[in-house]
Amino acid sequence: MARARIEQHWALAEFGAAELGDVRRQARLVQLARQLAERPEASLPQALENGAALKAAYRFFDNADIAHEKILASHVVSSLKRLKGHQVILAVQDTTLIDYSTHPGTEGLGPLHAKGGHGMICHGTLAFTPARLPLGVLGLRLWARDPEQPQRRTTRRTRPIEDKESYKWIDSVRAIAVLKAQLPGTRWVSVADRESDVFEFFTEAQALGVDVLTRAAWDRNVEGPEGQLFAELAAAPVVTYKQLALPARGKRKARTAKLEIRACALTLECPLNGSGRGLHPIALWGVWAYEPKPPAGVEPLDWKLLTSVPVTSADEALERLDWYAARWGIEQWHRVLKSGCRIEQRQLESFERLRRLLTVYAVIAWRILYATMLARLVPGMACTAILNDDEWQALYCRIHHCPAPPATPPPLKQAIRWIAQLGGFIGRVSDGEPGTQTLWQGFQQLIPMTEMYRIMKKPKLTRSSRPHKNVGND
């Protein structure tokens, strides 16, 4: 498991290798990342120290020579270092809409959906371990739809895949293949939701040697006695059972679902429409997790998964389900990005400026999520994994109302709970572990607290103790 320390100047580790054509731009990026991370919820004028810093930030985000891909590239290099030594990496990709409908004057944005909305599309790829520790943002595609060319269902089937938004899945798996070549001993699995159930996505991943794990959206034709995917899965044997804890989501209450798990080998036939020309049938494995007896009035959990990773036993079927559940991690990242970093409230004048800014916040949001999950997965490690000495000492003194901290730093799990306590976490037995929201709110309280601690612990010079010149003879 990755146990790399996040140094005091973490921004240097994540952005210090950015190749932006000028070392001054690189230094500005590192400084901006550090300042924005200290107050992720604040507007730019609030987060930056003075008018000069704000003006420099606007110049940076307005610079057409700085591509957002170059901003992210340095973080990807750091992420690959964290990935070394892992046998399996789950490259989870997902799409979210960034809504700027309240800023209609921003140039270069486009429609979000048929019913309205104005903003950009964000398609990210995050690296997770099978234990769901996020190790970095591997890819970030940001684009705005053309308002002159609405997405028409009538022409979608006949258009080439390169002209569809679903090409994002293929583009991302190609980027994963490039990273895979740098870690040849690691199995890379692209994990995605039902929107990625695109035949060309499966064939491209197979050609590149990247495994896939996706949720089926279409009842495709398959080779075999049943002829259809869903019927073939229903006819497969039950290999095991599982109880799955479902977190609260929207109006859905938290509950435990009792699932029966079926699994079998499958061969998907090529699509019958024009998009299937030149393709060949593809062999995959299917896993169906179904809740036969849900609570009254509750829709049953129903996951039909397709994967290129073999499923030959009950344990392997359960492992694929656990891997797919890692998708919740990228949804948490979206939440931190929108609610914690308040990216949809940012007011810059153009799409390109927003794209550069969002890339910086994408890494800041990852760091918050990383700290949260690290405390859950490695609770006994020292809190210096994410806090410098002044931070944990200030935190300890504040929580315990004492003037001096102990010599030994507390465990990471305890420190995280204290930080969350600053953000409103009560810590009752029924509350479970702190979430990302109370954690980022707590970090915001910790920053000024640490600054005051640094000031107060400095040696104090009184009038009588200050050095002075002798005015008489020695």
Locate predicted features:
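Single, function-defining residue in the core of a domain
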Residues: 1-106, 114-121, 126-474
